Amino acid sequence: MKKWLMVQGTTSDAGKSVLVAGLCRVLARRGIQVCPFKPQNMALNSAVTPDGGEIGRAQAVQAQACGIAPSVHMNPVLLKPNSDTGAQVILQGRALSNMEANAYHDYKKVAMDTVMDSFQRLQQEYEAIMIEGAGSPAEINLRENDIANMGFAEKADVPVIIVADIDRGGVFAHLYGTLALLSESEQARVKGFVINRFRGDIGLLQSGLDWLEQKTGKPVIGVLPYLHGFDLEAEDAIAAQQNLSADRQLRVAVPVFTRISNHTDFDPLRLNPNIDFRYVGQGESLSGADLIILPGSKSTRADLAYLRSQGWDKEILRHLRLGGKVMGICGGFQMLGEWVHDPLGIEGEAGSSEGLGLFAMQTELTAEKRLTNVKGHLTLDGQTVAAQGYEIHAGHSSWAADQKSPIILSDGSLDGLVSDCNQGFGTYLHGIFDRPETALRICQWAGAKEIEAYDHRAAQERAIDRIADAIEQHLDLTLLWPDL
């Protein structure tokens, strides 16, 4: 029997992504061929598929939970915001164009055809598809032409469960109100509710569960407990959990840009118990770090201006004068050069922005985006380790032949730079910290001589298994699939 199920939420960050990942692992454990699917994702955290397409990182993690490679059809529409009112539209892994919100609202009727094409392809290949909604299905202003929630569920004729985060408070109002704002046909599609992140005695919640079931006629499929210390890649929001301690081997600071992209790059550092890691927000100081890392950006020139508005440029230069280390990834790497040129207005108004000048490097943004998974070797301080990652960038950086590139890729090409003073290191590779030995080598270069390696992939697997175990224990899955 085919198993299609869509997980929608009462709010953003209700637990949809994690619940889908857990359900994928539960079904995969039973030998069921399962895959994830999200019709439309709005996120600056993206992944590269084996065939060179771009999808949301959440779907890549969910594919990992299934034990399969990610595909562009698992997230056929990806929106990458590049301003408060606009985004780059990516269809089936390929960039289409930049659109303002009003233009995209009209375009969604066309995008639905792409969504259905991808979904139907997956239906032919898999026994089960776990589908993730976006935000809330009860956003009245977004109901017209909806492709992310009930608009898709109705078109594809799939059942829905609604999840809410009780840790935020107001869970019964969220669930009851969300259901009430749906049409009759949409309400009929809802098979039940899941309450997420509950702390305390479940007996004290029972009267509320009984009331909800009586008022709505829908079952509460289960109540998932609050999993202390649980951490699985955030879909887009910066993770609140940070590693702050005075006795760590290395202190790392990452400034949060207005259009920061792929901040999941830093999860292997943020979760490493040997590292004091902090994100630095608006009005905060970078001081006190051993290593400052400039992250990726969807709008490099705009975020370079933002960096200067925060006074971080002066702090970075002072940090270098005092012997500290600075690293840049993708857009952050571009910022460390001399100039970033955007003659075509790829990221906004055409023009050029002066970089921080750590590298004698010029970057020109171009319409063509490079999307690829790569492997190679990284050499820092004369020691070489295996390295891998993925590139997602528009533009090309050039530098003099006598400058040192620390990364040699498997095709013989070079990536990144190390400054003459050995205090700066830049690379285009997202995910460079995912391999334990690579992260260890970079941390040692930054001054942490006795730091221990941290296996982020193994930690991800433990987190996926943990949520799957909680689902097995606390959800009545026979309410969804009697034959399971």
Curated annotation (Swiss-Prot):
Pathway: Cofactor biosynthesis; adenosylcobalamin biosynthesis. Keywords: Cobalamin biosynthesis, Glutamine amidotransferase. PROSITE patterns: GATASE_COBBQ. The keyword Phosphoprotein does not apply. Residues 249-438 form the GATase cobBQ-type domain. SUPFAM superfamilies: Class I glutamine amidotransferase-like, P-loop containing nucleoside triphosphate hydrolases. GO terms for molecular function: ABC-type vitamin B12 transporter activity; catalytic activity. It comes from the Bacteria. The active site is at C330, H430. GO terms for biological process: cobalamin biosynthetic process. Catalyzes amidations at positions B, D, E, and G on adenosylcobyrinic A,C-diamide. NH(2) groups are provided by glutamine, and one molecule of ATP is hydrogenolyzed for each amidation. Belongs to the CobB/CobQ family. CobQ subfamily. HAMAP family: CobQ (MF_00028). This is Cobyric acid synthase. It comes from Vibrio cholerae serotype O1 (strain ATCC 39315 / El Tor Inaba N16961).
